[in-house]
Amino acid sequence: MAQVAKKILVTCALPYANGSIHLGHMLEHIQADIWVRFQRMRGNQVHFICADDAHGTPIMLKAQQMGIEPEQMIAEMSQEHQQDFAGFAISYDNYHSTHSDENRELSSLIYGRLKANGYIKNRTISQLYDPEKGMFLPDRFVKGTCPKCKAPEQYGDNCEVCGATYSPTELIDPKSAVSGATPVMRESEHFFFDLPAFSDMLQAWTRSGALQEQVANKMQEWFDSGLQQWDITRDAPYFGFEVPDAPGKYFYVWLDAPIGYMGAFKNLCDKRGDLDFDEFWGKDAKTDLYHFIGKDIVYFHSLFWPAMLEGSNFRKPTNLFVHGYVTVNGAKMSKSRGTFIKAGTYLKYLDADCLRYYYAAKLSSRIDDIDLNLEDFVQRVNADIVNKVVNLASRNAGFINKRFAGQLADQLADPVLYKTFTDAATSIADAYNNRESGKAIREIMALADVANRYVDEQAPWVVAKQEGHDADLHAICSMGINLFRVLMTYLKPVLPSLTERTEAFLNTELTWDSIEQPLLGHSITAFKALFNRIDLDKVNEMVASSKEDMAPATRVTGPLADDPIQETISFDDFAKVDMRIALIQQAEFVEGSDKLLKLTLELGGETRQIFSGIRSAYPDPKALEGRMTVMVANLAPRKMRFGVSEGMVMTAGPGGSDIFLLSPDSGAQPGMQVK
């Protein structure tokens, strides 16, 4: 009995409409597109949607800086985003915006239902207010000195140096990041979503299979620490949707942003007329709903979003598919190094299929970060796509075209070998379906090695010179072309542009169900180059064109200018600080934090655990193990969300990827005092 086609709705996280798409963004859109293309090849009905996240204070302020209205800015940004996604062959059925009539109506509907069901609470809160701009300041628009480690220029929600979290009112010497003014405290009534009311439902949903194990474990930490009511409103001025019957109050961007998934699909339904919105979003929907997201927005998608849907009588997602971050050459993307590469810049220099293949080869169902090593990128694409796959076609097509008028043989030279290739369809399909594209690629390339070994052993270039062996030559080369066809069918979800050229060359569509039947007595077209090798010089040009001079042209820069020397202290004050040499025994990531590393330090007879905000500069923590460093040993232990930090390691630098762990001269031993 034929398998019943599934009805599936797939979304990617909505790109924020205040900046360009870069190669970090593209990981998610490529991963989702590969999965969608595979599902379509298997006969499932997939609707693939996305939209720009177009609301919030950052967009309002950036538009002001540009001297244009927010509506104009987000329209221009949407056009750029859609052009980039089209350039990478992301097969969206609809790309919309959260600043839309559909989203306004759905946001108001969901809010109204939540309010009617008793899940909206009113509370007066105190907030920092910019007296010059006449606006309340979100956390990220306040900067000051960290109340924990005293690091300057930290945002109002957490410290990028020590990893501490706090409220903006706890900052020392806070300043508005908008105007530079000293903010004042003002009270305002806000509306809160009663998230704790959904704790039992969320805990059951967490363990229902809707989340990866890593995500479910992280959520358990949030449950253990207790859920809090969620502030869903912001005060004017704000670019977004005004709350019904509450003049001057606006929905917080994270309320209407996920509703944008629904708005984009509603817009598609209205365009097509053959889709039923409720079939995919109704409370008892039997269709599948999948969200591809990055690990940085798990909190919103795994807690607030399903709770909002439950409380407003809509269905919850079938699954969240969470991925990690992208690093380039082992480090965080950097504008100064040219590794912060925009999607549009990439497309000026390289084929989109190259990046699609490289990401596919590295992706799995886990939340691990992926490193785009540019030298490895060049080597892998050239070795796999050009040397193994495309070369298989070029080695055989010439003989078929010249000696046999483009006609393939009527019989397979090696039916057993061909069956080996088609038998792999099940395991490769399982890998794609489970988002293990890296596993699928490894299996496909292993088959490519077998195919090339077959051609090497049969040596058609030798057979071509032997009289009376035309039938053998015909059979060998036809076998090679058929193996190439199977490989390209397996690679079709990953390489859409190469697939299109391949289908034109083979004069047939590549479908999963047709590979059981080889191409026999079939006419192919004249072979043309299907894929070009990557030139490392092109990659270097791309990097060079992505470099930005990060230094402001109008002021003197340097460590002292950026970070002035603090006021003078007495020797007695300094003597209170006990700094010691420490050996880093172990360094590891902290699950749930994209800024912290957990360090186990040995001080010569004593072991300490420290959480340090240096992850952005040291993406491979294992490289720190065995290294000597300097730590403040008599700092009071500090309880953090992830455990107790028993000191602080000494670093230099402004932050981000420019953090430098201090090390002693050779000969220093763990436990020695730094004087």
UniProtKB/Swiss-Prot annotation:
Binds 1 zinc ion per subunit. Homodimer. GO terms for molecular function: ATP binding; metal ion binding; methionine-tRNA ligase activity; tRNA binding. It comes from the Bacteria. It is found in: Cytoplasm. ATP binds at K335. This is Methionine--tRNA ligase. GO terms for cellular component: cytosol. NCBIfam families: metG, metG_C_term, PRK00133.1. Its main location: cytoplasm. Its EC number is 6.1.1.10. The lineage of its organism: Bacteria, Pseudomonadati, Pseudomonadota, Gammaproteobacteria, Enterobacterales. Belongs to the class-I aminoacyl-tRNA synthetase family. MetG type 1 subfamily. Zn(2+) binds at C146, C149, C159, C162.
